[in-house]
């Protein structure tokens, strides 16, 4: 209610609530930098955030880092939307670092789709500083895909080429350890593979398939010979 009132948002609060919850999530695979503090159940890796509590039971506020990224000094120079004579939110924000690279973005639009993988904020900052110092491109630090708290591996299996325009592809692997001949302990899942979904997948593998009618008939034939 407060946010929609002061931002001139007229499209219903359901999508607004979902956006706020998503910006506060901090489990592995959500945000590298969550701009809001999650006070309550904002979702976990069990269901990829779908297990967040109802909006009326959770609370949030700006995180400590948010105002360091979206500088207060910029407020006076931003262009603001005029909503029926009331100045509301800015037409766009100007963060100190590109947040689309920090937290990534995935979705569809009219005639296009996007899938930007998250990257390491510290490497992004180092790269920006190198650009400001006019360091040659070859001497600038690399920016690698990064998911805060992820213990698995991320490997580039199709390096991007500036000349051919090929897209980079990354293979994300979890980790496991063999503890016995018939026992494996999974210690990390690939990002985007949520715990409950993977548990359901494993349980299906453990199910003994029911014998088909054809197999039953074959068994009867062998027994009668």
Named regions from a protein language model:
Residues 1-167, 216-218:
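Catalytic phosphate-handling regions of large nucleic-acid enzymes and associated NTPases
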Residues 136-225:
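Charged, surface-exposed alpha-helical interface/stalk elements
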């Amino acid at each position: 209610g407060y946010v929609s009132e002061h931002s001139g948002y007229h499209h219903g609060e359901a999508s607004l609530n979902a956006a706020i919850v998503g910006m506060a999530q901090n489990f592995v695979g959500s945000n590298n930098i969550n701009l809001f503090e999650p006070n309550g159940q904002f979702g976990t890796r069990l269901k990829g955030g779908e297990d967040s509590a109802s909006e009326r039971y959770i609370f949030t506020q700006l995180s400590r880092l948010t105002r360091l990224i979206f500088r207060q000094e910029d407020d006076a120079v931003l262009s603001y939307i005029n909503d029926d004579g009331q100045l509301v939110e800015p037409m766009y924000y100007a963060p100190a670092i590109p947040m689309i690279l920090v937290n990534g973005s995935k979705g569809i639009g009219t005639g296009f789709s996007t899938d930007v993988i998250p990257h390491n904020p510290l490497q992004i900052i180092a790269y920006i500083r190198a650009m400001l110092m006019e360091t040659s491109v070859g001497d600038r630090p690399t920016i690698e895909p990064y998911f805060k708290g992820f213990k698995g591996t991320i490997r580039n299996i199709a390096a991007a080429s500036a000349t051919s325009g090929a897209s980079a592809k990354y293979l994300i692997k979890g980790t496991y350890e063999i503890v016995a001949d018939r026992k494996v302990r999974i210690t990390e899942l690939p990002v985007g593979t949520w715990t409950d979904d993977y548990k359901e997948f494993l349980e299906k593998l453990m199910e003994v398939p029911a014998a088909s009618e054809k197999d039953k008939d074959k068994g009867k034939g062998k027994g009668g010979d």
